[in-house]
Swiss-Prot record:
Keywords: Ribonucleoprotein, Ribosomal protein, RNA-binding, rRNA-binding
PANTHER family associated with the record: LARGE RIBOSOMAL SUBUNIT PROTEIN UL2M, RIBOSOMAL PROTEIN L2
GO biological process annotation, one example: cytoplasmic translation
Keyword Ribosomal protein: yes
Segments for region (Disordered): 224-265
InterPro entries assigned: NA-bd_OB-fold, Rib_uL2_dom2, Ribosomal_uL2, Ribosomal_uL2_bac/org-type, Ribosomal_uL2_C, Ribosomal_uL2_CS, Ribosomal_uL2_dom3, Ribosomal_uL2_RNA-bd_dom
The family this protein is said to belong to: Belongs to the universal ribosomal protein uL2 family.
Organism lineage: Bacteria, Pseudomonadati, Pseudomonadota, Gammaproteobacteria, Cardiobacteriales
Name the record gives this protein: Large ribosomal subunit protein uL2
Subunit structure: Part of the 50S ribosomal subunit. Forms a bridge to the 30S subunit in the 70S ribosome.
Pfam families: Ribosomal_L2 (PF00181), Ribosomal_L2_C (PF03947)
GO molecular function, one term: structural constituent of ribosome
Length: 276
């Protein structure tokens, strides 16, 4: 992959930075693993906005991704790498030796023709999926399960990875990119390596319309709203709110802890690093 800085032929092109992806498949996705995707535009079943800044965007089809990687003991060939509009990482189409095809999250250096394998007997190689009790301590991993058989939940986005730093009894300790250290059952699976498209963070969209293509609507500051719309709104001219920053519903919005899952607090060995 290479970074492209465009010539400033227009204001939108001036600031745009793209990443070349010559290794990706240029045709349509595998039809049997594609489903219709309807947009909710951030509305719930009553039609009220529950998630702001969503709506519009280019039509997308959902690719069915195998997050469980539970087809054990059978070699699979990487047929091709593909772009997926539903996630930042690339996806790989695997063809197992019995003829079945599945999409998986692609590893960083994965390419067409590679052989991958799932299960306890899989070799220690990037792209292979194993229970974490069979993975050497210190390995870089991604697509980490939190419950055996539930499917990957951690380290799934572009360039993401985690590190297995310890194994003791029925648990392993996983260090995440945020700095958090977490206990995970050793029977949970993970994939060796790191997620593809690690240069995703280097791209710049260049114009507001490029974000609209993705279904992302504008974010309006509360201080420029009317007082009926936001606690920071109102006033003649530019005025500070006179209070600590809050959300539209009056809750503190900077550094306010929202975690409410006490059941798994005991599994977090070290909290994530503070930002800023």
């Amino acid at each position: 992959m290479a970074i492209i800085n465009h010539k400033p032929t227009s204001p939108g092109r001036r600031g745009r930075v793209d990443v070349t992806r010559p290794e990706l498949h240029k045709g349509k996705p595998f039809a049997a693993l594609v489903e219709k995707k309807t947009r909710g535009s951030g509305r719930n079943n009553a039609g009220r906005i529950t998630v702001r800044h969503k709506g519009g965007g280019h039509a997308q089809k959902y690719r069915l991704i195998d997050f469980c990687r539970n087809k054990d003991g059978i070699d699979a060939v990487v047929e091709r790498l593909e772009y997926d509009p539903n996630r930042t990482s690339f996806i790989a189409l695997l063809r197992y030796s019995d003829g079945e095809r599945r999409y998986v999250i692609a590893a960083r250096d994965m390419k067409a023709g590679d052989i991958v394998r799932n299960g306890e007997d899989a070799p220690i190689k990037d792209g292979n999926c194993l229970p974490m009790r069979n993975i050497p301590v210190g390995s870089t991993i991604y697509c980490v399960e939190l419950k055996p058989g539930k499917g990957a939940q951690l380290a799934r986005s572009a360039g993401a990875s985690a590190q297995m730093v310890a194994r003791e009894g029925k648990y392993v300790t996983v260090r995440l990119k945020s700095g958090e250290r977490r206990l995970v059952l050793a029977d949970c699976r993970a994939v060796l390596g790191e997620v593809s498209n690690h240069e995703h963070s280097l791209r710049s969209y260049g114009k507001a319309g490029a974000k609209r293509w993705l279904g992302i609507r504008p974010t309006v500051r509360g201080v420029v709203m009317n007082p009926v719309d936001h606690p920071h709104g109102g006033g003649e001219g530019r005025t500070a709110s006179g209070r600590h920053p809050v959300s539209p519903w009056g809750l503190p919005t900077k550094g306010y802890k929202t975690r409410n899952n006490k059941r798994t607090d005991s599994l977090i060995v070290q909290r994530r690093k503070k930002r800023g």
